[in-house]
């Protein structure tokens, strides 16, 4: 596999002529570069006017390689050729280097360029690219490739330091070298026109009297700041090393190279706006700096942003009233690392009410607006603090978390949101502090953790404590003056929604869909629509094979009243057949039977279970687990039951006798109740391990909940 490298633009704040003179001081030998043994000139050409100078050198290197590699290769030194082409008129130097040793087995190519900064003619820019292709090296291709990459990366960091050293040495003797001018060129530049004014010393040396900074130098700083804070980059901009250090952070030479590769590749093949450098770096980190994988991720994200008009979401999308009033989340100052901090009181969130009142689309847009806002806040923090801030912190308060938060449509909506964020906002989460985690949290974590990237999971820290102990732990991550009041601090969070139950009057109307349902909408894809008639209940038989499972359910009464009960039987019971997806007498009885059922319904004794009429309450084979509760039209109910025994559980909905008794005998509409329902079994085996691993999180101190990374086979453990 060909290994490539491309450097960002490195800037020397010295004129091109000074940099070139310092560069030549490295030859024929350079003690500052230990592996550089020496060089000899093999070819040299100078133009008559002195504007062009081409020189070829054969250089000798003492490569630091394992003894075995040197022994097999049979050499102590390696040789490469270097061709320097200097054009004083254009003020450029092009360097081409290739290996001589083992050229049939290894191909090494390096190209470097020195040129004048486009916005400041007294600065010099440097760019570098290289490629390595190990074809065949005595069966040690992988080892040689890793060795070469490591050595090359180590020498890159020294390159600028060494040239800066020679520049400083040169400036001790002279501070000005005349530019090349053609013989017939008139001298039109006066001392007052020059950006650098010189003064000659008594010993003949010259010094800088006034280094007048060009106007564009200040503009460059503004442009860099704008580029760091904007969502998208200038398509023609180049990466500069100082800009990377200032706005993106300290990167290794190879990481800088990968950033340059993906940026310039996207610029060459993609028309239109691109994610800014900070966001490109996030994609690279999410894919371990694999340029090909990161590029695929960026392409998919660009398409997704266009399809959903994400670039304008902060300007065009308005939060619905229910979100403004009842969504308990907001931005809240910053953590100790300077990262913007978002607080979400998830335990106070009515997941069902929020989803039923504003829909999946608005909740997704809410998340996207938070992420887009977070990117802007991180960029603003970078500008304000003078240090790179590329992510934000999330504090999740789980006080109030219960089984109702495990409502399947809500969990499915959450998983969809996680999927979108992982794909389009990678590496934006600096840390996640989960506080006041109750015992039900392991169940929720088991459901969502497989969909969270492993790197992100490692950033989750959980605490189950409260009060003063929790406050002390929070002080390790958050300045005391910023700790929220509901977590024991003094900082008010007045811009957060209240949370709590969303009034049913704000619910959107439920559209019943007979037959096929939308797979995109968890409300429609999850629920089953059915009807129960007087004397003909709806019964759902649920076999539980292992004790310790949790049965959860949710239903909405759409028309008339119904009565809900939960039974348990030690007997094996089959689910009754249902025709056309609805368990109603219209598909079972003929009209005469329906009239007879209505007439005799008041006096006829119905069995406790329609699916097993031989079983009676009070016998060892059948018992009532949840007493009958009457729900009226428009009611919504979420519930859960801990299955302490294995056996058969039966959920039953029936028309209550009280409702039927007050209606006309032939008023068939009052004997029918329509509802939608769903249920889910949470198997104890799926979260038993999570419960055990999270027991340590019951204390007030924060603990990581990410599983330990298994050691690579053959890798010794740390003692």
UniProtKB/Swiss-Prot annotation:
PROSITE patterns for this protein: CRAL_TRIO, GOLD, PRELI_MSF1
Stored SUPFAM superfamilies: CRAL/TRIO domain (SSF52087), CRAL/TRIO N-terminal domain (SSF46938), Supernatant protein factor (SPF), C-terminal domain (SSF101576)
Segments forming domain CRAL-TRIO: 319-495
Cellular component annotations (GO), alphabetically ordered: cytoplasm
SMART domains the record matches: CRAL_TRIO_N (SM01100), SEC14 (SM00516)
Annotated Pfam families: CRAL_TRIO, CRAL_TRIO_N, PRELI
GOLD domain location: 524-681
Domain PRELI/MSF1: 2-175
Residue ranges with Pro residues bias: 707-719
Region called Disordered, residue ranges: 700-719
Protein name (Swiss-Prot/TrEMBL): CRAL-TRIO domain-containing protein T23G5.2
Organism: Caenorhabditis elegans
